[in-house]
Amino acid sequence: MSQLKLNPYFGEYGGMYVPQILVPALKQLENAFVEAQADESFQAEFTDLLKNYAGRPTALTLTRNLSPNPMVKIYLKREDLLHGGAHKTNQVLGQALLAKRMGKKEIIAETGAGQHGVATALACALLGLKCKVYMGAKDVARQSPNVFRMRLMGAEVIPVTSGSATLKDACNEAMRDWSGSYEKAHYLLGTAAGPHPFPTIVREFQRMIGEETKKQMLEREGRLPDAVIACVGGGSNAIGMFADFIDETSVELIGVEPAGKGIDTHMHGAPLKHGKTGIFFGMKAPLMQDSEGQIEESYSISAGLDFPSVGPQHAHLNAIGRARYESATDDEALEAFQLLARSEGIIPALESAHALAYALRLARECTKETILVVNLSGRGDKDIFTVSDILNGKEE
């Protein structure tokens, strides 16, 4: 590993646990990334796409009616306003540009909720790249609007029926494909997890979320927030929000994992607080495992958080106590989803509703003037059928 230019570990987490055949591809990717980061023309093109195609900077909205406590201001970082409907577009444009720079003609991706798949499809359409998206068969069924969007933009969507037919299985299939095609294809990983250098690349291509938030906060309030709150599945929207605040020790960093039907039911997706360290998806990280070390199925009402592991930098921030990780149940997320729609006229993604749910819980407990920023990582159009079915079921 001595030829690596960047540290593949965050404390004890991370690394490059992949078949030998993929090591040259990952080293080539790291090298290209380091060069691109130092290349002004690459940065200028990336910035131009973010501004004039994706619509950055995104708004920082002070909620008018949402806060349950008059002493607490709740701001929303509006990644839901980004082209494509979620924060995913940021880093996908970065990686797609990087792939073109490396001379790759094809993109391979995995997707859970379909948001990363949609973002990948739009970037490939824009930049003239062939696009293949692996998606668990269960997710294909529960996210049909996004499947149609991907196909409409020219992507090939491949349903994965192995294992639990969800995101982790799509990840495995995508990785398998890439190991036989990396000469011509780039694997565009959708979260800040997986083997090095992906967690670092994804963080750097998402960090404008926190950078903009910091600047907007200083303009609006003349100070930094007391806490920034983001949902955590693999952890890319959260690390994008956290990265620029890590050195600002007055700002609490709070990640919210999905507690599903309740932590004690084992039907959750909260490996950071309730998993054990293991090797999965090319990295060493907290993982949902049974007593024999087999990977347990994760569960969440939101397909994008339904992931049995978490990015290595989050594991490290948790271990050193710089960030804290909480959880919110399906029911709490559903309640927050409806509350934001009714109180502010904004329909959040179910993923983002988990962060919102915890922010509301925290706001109720505050006893002094407090400013909270919730990363509203995506919009909820994709979830209206899921929520409608649940609410109708509940009302019967």
From Swiss-Prot:
It catalyses: (1S,2R)-1-C-(indol-3-yl)glycerol 3-phosphate + L-serine = D-glyceraldehyde 3-phosphate + L-tryptophan + H2O. GO terms for cellular component: cytoplasm. Keywords: Amino-acid biosynthesis, Aromatic amino acid biosynthesis, Lyase, Pyridoxal phosphate, Tryptophan biosynthesis. The keyword Lyase applies. Gene3D superfamilies: 3.40.50.1100. Pathway: Amino-acid biosynthesis; L-tryptophan biosynthesis; L-tryptophan from chorismate: step 5/5. It is an enzyme of class 4 (lyase). The modification N6-(pyridoxal phosphate)lysine is found at K88. Its EC number is 4.2.1.20. Its cofactor is pyridoxal 5'-phosphate. GO terms for molecular function: tryptophan synthase activity. NCBIfam families: trpB. Belongs to the TrpB family. The beta subunit is responsible for the synthesis of L-tryptophan from indole and L-serine. Tetramer of two alpha and two beta chains. This is Tryptophan synthase beta chain. The lineage of its organism: Bacteria, Pseudomonadati, Pseudomonadota, Gammaproteobacteria, Alteromonadales. The gene is trpB.
